Amino acid sequence: MTVDALLPLLSEDRAFYDNSGGGITLFGGECLLQADFCAALLKACKAAGLRTAVDTCGDVPRAAFDKVMPYTDRFLYDLKAIDEDVHIAATGRSNRRILENLRYIDACGKAFEVRYPFVPDYNADQAEKIAAFVKTLSRCVGVKVLPYHNLAGSKYAALGMKNTLPAALPTAAEVAAAQKLFE
């Protein structure tokens, strides 16, 4: 699909965006792996007067951010851990670039919301560290604690794969305590 084909479809909901204060959010997998297309689409959306956001895990080259930054009003930024060893244990990848890119977004003056997936037995101990890190940034407009759920378990079974996801779900009290750290 092309930008020219997408823009009329996205513009159909303009009244909803205007009434809700919303706009176009690019997400799915890691949309910034397609930074050139994202930049072209965001540029067209801005030219059409639409508000824009990008949902990202931040583990992409800085050049991807440079391409979309001029056309992005807000970033939704996943932050799983501050401690590199915790991040590597869960994802197999370092979080250095993720943290550097979030600092970069902040330095560029762009608004962002941190989204913290809260997973017992993985990163529950990271909430205070994430809160302390976020407080060093000036453009954060909020933090959402996203409680872990095990809905993917049935998908593993259907695919005949071993489910390696944690079994424990966070309690409402644990989630509330984590969210309180960000107030």
Segments the model singles out, each with a brief description of its role:
Residues 1-5:
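FAD-binding FR-type
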Residues 7, 11-151, 155-157:
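Conserved AdoMet/S-adenosylmethionine-binding subsite of the radical SAM
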Residues 141, 157-180:
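A structural motif corresponding to the C-terminal lobe/cap of the Radical SAM core domain
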